[in-house]
Regions:
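Aromatic-anchored glycine-rich loop motif in surface-exposed flexible loops
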Residues: 1-83, 94-112, 254-276, 283-300
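An aromatic- and glycine-enriched ligand-binding surface/loop that stacks and positions planar moieties
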Residues: 33, 63-66, 82-243
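Active-site lining segments that contact anionic ligands and/or coordinate catalytic metals
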Residues: 154-156, 220, 271, 278, ...
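Conserved oxyanion/phosphate-binding beta-strand-loop segments in alpha/beta enzyme cores
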Residues: 242-250
Length: 300
């Protein structure tokens, strides 16, 4: 029974993961908790269930997963990437914060927004103060998303999709980043300045930020690790935003976060994809506390 419960726990985790994704996209969705034996089953055409009902089922699935999944440090090396108790807690944090703030600001029917925020807070506190299985990566923001940040040795990893050497499963991340992916100016403006303030309030932003190089001045250093400077080494030579080879970036801000120069050919990418990381837990914890209380007074 223990073995069966372990695999049921994995299935329940992914059911919660995907139902949460459906709720984010569609709101109310049909909640199907059985396999269909025949196409004549009336539930095939079942109507939508309230989003609160679906989210509560997600919590139940994740609670079961939390009881029966292994701790992340007990997962064998060959099974790295399988879901763990940490992943279940991380999903509770993600769902609780999202649903809590959604109900608070959109006033969707059913449930209490503070109850969802409390779910996120409780799960985050269990990870941060009780289990202490995770910590932030210390070897640089840029390396976090490259091969350096892979595996169990990086304690920031909570749940990742593992990609392998050629011949197994690979991706086109670096190739696509250098093809059509671009950051909008609106997203760029969310990067704070060194005084901790956004563009419209900062006292240290340059008088002009028309050129691409201007946008990096007195900015959160993570911006320079996320998009290219002009003439910075990139795919097929230095990045020149207004030349023909670089015009696939519709907004002129080319993404370099996660780009690996040696993996620019089709299906050659093998660095793992982070799905849940510890930084998300920390910032979600702070946000959930603020949304619940209107302030953050936790001395921890």
């Amino acid at each position: 029974q223990t073995i069966k419960d372990r695999w049921l726990a994995e299935a329940f985790f992914f059911r919660a993961y995907h139902y949460f994704d459906l709720v984010k996209k569609y709101g109310d969705v049909p909640l199907i908790l059985k396999a269909f034996d025949t196409t004549s089953d009336p539930d095939i055409k079942r109507g939508r269930d309230p989003r609160e009902t679906v989210i509560q089922q997600c919590y139940e699935d994740l609670d079961f997963a939390l009881q029966h999944l292994p701790e992340i440090d007990d997962i064998p090396e060959g099974d790295w990437g399988r879901v763990s108790q940490s992943a279940a807690l991380g999903m509770i944090v993600r769902i609780g914060l999202y649903e809590g703030t959604h109900k608070k600001y959109h006033q969707t029917p059913g449930g209490d927004y503070k109850a969802h925020l409390q779910k996120a807070i409780d799960a985050a506190e269990e990870m941060i103060y009780i289990r202490k299985d995770h910590e932030l990566y210390q070897n640089g923001f840029e390396k976090l998303f490259l091969h350096d940040g892979e595996g169990r040795q990086n304690k920031e990893n909570i749940f990742v999709k593992v990609y392998g050497p050629l011949g197994t499963i690979n991706h086109n991340n670096s190739r696509e980043l250098e093809s059509t992916v671009s950051m909008t100016r609106n997203m760029l403006d969310n990067f704070l300045y060194t005084d901790g303030l956004p563009r419209e309030k900062s006292q240290v932003r340059p008088l002009t930020d028309i050129s691409i190089d201007d946008i990096f001045i007195n900015r959160d250093p993570r911006l320079a690790m996320t998009i290219y400077h002009v003439n910075e080494k990139a795919y097929k030579g230095p990045y020149k935003p207004f030349e023909t080879n670089s015009q696939n970036h519709p907004f002129g801000y080319a993404i370099k976060k996660g780009f690996i120069l040696e993996e620019d050919q089709s299906n050659s990418g093998s660095n793992d994809k982070m799905i849940i990381r510890y930084a998300e837990i920390l910032i979600s914890y702070a946000e959930a506390l603020y949304e619940r209380d209107g302030s953050i007074s936790n001395p921890k």
